Curated annotation (Swiss-Prot):
GO terms for molecular function: protein homodimerization activity. It holds the Pfam family Fibin. This is Fin bud initiation factor homolog. It comes from Homo sapiens (Human). Belongs to the FIBIN family.
Length: 211
């Protein structure tokens, strides 16, 4: 009988330690109200809230480790009305947050109905800008090629003009040499003619003086 009582007390203590049936204790994190239960059934003070699931059961039972007259327990525990009040405030806060998000989204969308249309419009604008830049680059390349062709034509024209001037100068030089050779021959012929005329004049002079 004593063993049975001892077994029941140990079993009850084990249940009190391993199962948390207390109220929804608020855990304030980033201004939001969270309620957790321990998945493995072994409640500890250092349980990670991120690994605990949300508890939807509403209870006003106090924690096993806290007495009924504990001032800290009365401050930490919330009634059902208070919890619904807090939840209502959270809903209002969430509504305001969603309203701000919708305003920021509408501002980001720039008058479009959805992100898909906005992204399609942006992609069209980017495509148009890319096509315009590609067209401008093509025009610049064609103008550059035209400038190169004009420069090459001007250079070839200058080369042709220079070669033409060289040929013309060479022909003029040859003609001048030919003329100078002809003038030299004429000069020699003229000198011979003058000498012959001088000889004849001297002979005529001597003949005239003798008479």
């Amino acid at each position: 009988m004593v063993f049975l009582k001892f077994f029941c007390m140990s079993f009850f203590c084990h249940l009190c330690q391993g199962y948390f049936d207390g109220p929804l204790y608020p855990e304030m994190s980033n201004g939001t109200l969270h309620h957790y239960f321990v998945p493995d059934g072994d409640y500890e003070e250092n349980d990670d809230p991120e690994k605990c699931q949300l508890l939807f059961r509403v209870s006003d039972h106090r924690r096993c480790s806290q007495g009924e007259g504990s001032q800290v327990g009365s401050l930490l525990s919330l009634t059902l009305r208070e919890e619904f009040t807090v939840l209502g405030r959270q809903v209002e806060d969430a509504g305001r947050v969603l309203e701000g998000i919708s305003k920021s989204i509408s501002y980001d969308l720039d008058g479009e109905e959805s992100y898909g249309k906005y992204l399609r419009r942006e992609s069209h604008q980017i495509g148009d800008a890319y096509s315009n830049s590609d067209k401008s680059l093509t025009e610049l390349e064609s103008k550059f090629k035209q400038g190169q062709e004009q420069d090459s034509r001007q250079e070839s024209r200058l080369n042709e003009d220079f070669l033409g001037m060289l040929v013309h100068t060479r022909s003029l030089l040859k003609e001048t040499l030919d003329i100078s050779v002809g003038l030299r021959d004429k000069y020699e012929l003229l000198a011979l003619t003058i000498r012959s005329h001088g000889t004849r004049l001297g002979r005529l002079k001597n003949d005239y003086l003798k008479v």
